[in-house]
């Protein structure tokens, strides 16, 4: 009898007590800083636009979060994006390409790696295109190429600056030559913006590599980058294995590229909106320069 009572206590009562007082803890309650190992509340990180307080490490953002951060509240409209053929090569590696697309869409809630929005940034009309690294590494395929071109066409139609937030591992291998074809297509779209004298500003985020770096991500009128962003064609490990030499510290990082003239400015995420708005305001004011009268030229410039 005593044994049966003990079994009932251990097998029935104790588990129920544990269940009664168990608190469900969300999996994303804490965020660990990749640099320092510091544990921070997810809500606190989100409130700081996904920058770790203290270390200032910039975490990746989704396209939706990026657009929400940049656009003035209540001014943002999604730009409808054209559909592209799905898996024209019937590609399969360890998994069918159509299944990879299905998984990525379920994970991100996006149709593909690009999201384009039209609205106001700092009061200025602007067209923004954002790559989401969470969708198959932000890879460039036919749908992404179509989205970039549609964003450029929107900027041309509405006479606004075009601002790109790049985040990609490069061309999408599952689409082969059809993916590589997007490199010249997007380059032509940038050329159309240039001929229309509309600013094209690129913000390089972590990481921006491969065919994206070899095309539209390096064709901007102004190139900004977030701190610590990896920017290059091939990754540092591939380069080291190829040349069999140790690369310099910080090689291919935003700060290194800034020091060597590859980009114009490294901008903290909290300052991006104001910086982009200021640049676009300056570049959109492009009246023809007229020589000042001689009398006016002699007057001192007011402080």
Curated annotation (Swiss-Prot):
Pfam families: Carboxyl_trans. Residues 29-298 form the CoA carboxyltransferase N-terminal domain. The keyword Glycoprotein does not apply. Pathway: Lipid metabolism; malonyl-CoA biosynthesis; malonyl-CoA from acetyl-CoA: step 1/1. Its main location: cytoplasm. Belongs to the AccD/PCCB family. PANTHER family: ACETYL-COENZYME A CARBOXYLASE CARBOXYL TRANSFERASE SUBUNIT BETA, CHLOROPLASTIC (PTHR42995:SF5). This is Acetyl-coenzyme A carboxylase carboxyl transferase subunit beta. It comes from Methylobacterium sp. (strain 4-46). The gene is accD.
